Amino acid sequence: MILRATFENIYSIKDETQISFVAGKSNAHPSHVSRAEKRDDISVLKAGIVYGANASGKSNVIKAIALLQQIANGNFPQSKVEPFKLADTEEKNSKVEIEFKTKGKCFAYGMEFTVGGIKEEWLFEINSRTDKEVFTRKVTDDGNEFTFGKVDGNEETSMLLKFIAHSTPSDSSFLSEYVRRNGKGLETIRMAKNWFADGLKIIFPSTRLQGISFLTENNDELQETTRSLLAYFNTGISDVRLYKIKKEDVNLSSDLLDNILSKAKNGKTYSMAATVGGEMLLFEVNANGGYEIYKQKAVHRNLTSGTEVVFDLSEESDGSIRLLDFIPMLIDLKQNEVDYLIDEIDRSMHPMLSQKILECYFSGLESGRDTQLIFSTHECNLLNLDLIRADEVWFVEKGKDGASHLTSLAEFKPREDVRKGYLLGRYGAIPFFAPISQLKW
């Protein structure tokens, strides 16, 4: 779960800016909060909503978190490192830090970097009162300089740790190198890395999730849950199933095929999903190198005869396909401790669907399970304090300097109709236009 994120000199964010999902003192919607159980614990919100006008920078908040995730996982994408360009800050370091909770522990992981690579990197174990260093890294012309907190193990463990530390290249995170080279002595690093790799899932408008039928195949309970959600969202789709297709009908590159076939190990059948020609396909590989290809299709029911009619997903609307991407997410959130960030949740969908997705998520919350759903949106009907808490809402607005600024709805202490107040511009984060009479065209 994300507690807070801090950004500086990245994308449209100039000065140090913070977004927080630490729960305030409000007693509203108690199920929306993972409450602190011990004195040093931190209470965290299970939902977050980010509003802003077009080009306000709300997507950049999620992009910056995604960038840190990518670097933490071992991939430094130079093309995605973009410092703030509307001031003399392009030569300064960019900074992103995330404080997060996983497996009952809270961490602060962050770094400073330029297009050329990482300049500083750190990981601390934190609670409401203290910070405990795991490691701090500074990259100089002479290489890496490290300090470590308590290291468990013998001298051999310590020597391996130092070797990994000093041989970590500037375009790679120590977090990923420690795990890749099977480091020992600082197991909290592995816990933090696992959260970035498996616990944090980010969805952009162009992201295609693994299809519903790929996840529910051979699982009757999940199939029933999927059919229930399809009916609830009134898609007209009664089911989504896998259908075998001919290999000659798939334009499959040799590199992708080699990658797929290489996954079969230990005499076991292996399945993996891959996007080919814009379509999500499932490849089932046996131990002998043979394989079959499947695609998912939507099943409708003829209302007159009751017979099933099968449609390619290309025949479905963009909104239906977008919704089909979100159903696996809702199932994942209900069953596992995972955190989802979605950019523009309402893209291609009816405004009411965003509300229903949020209501569906809230209905499945359980006090003992730490999950989190954070998304950006324009949908003002969600600004309803009967549905959400004020501290779950953030507004992003650009100032006169072109830089994005973040403000929490809780700072306004709203009591009135929040939706109406937002549309009237009381909280900012909406577009303002000159009178149409001034338009020269």
Question: Residues of each region from the PLM?
Answer:
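A short, compositionally biased
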Residues: M1, E91-K95, T114-K119, G289-K295, ...
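Short acidic/polar mixed-charge low-complexity motifs
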Residues: I13-D15, K103-F107, G117, R129-D131, ...
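Conserved P-loop NTP-binding catalytic core
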Residues: V33-A55, S59-I118
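Short Pro/Gly-enriched beta-strand edge/turn motifs at strand-loop
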Residues: Q78-E82, G277-M280, T377-E379
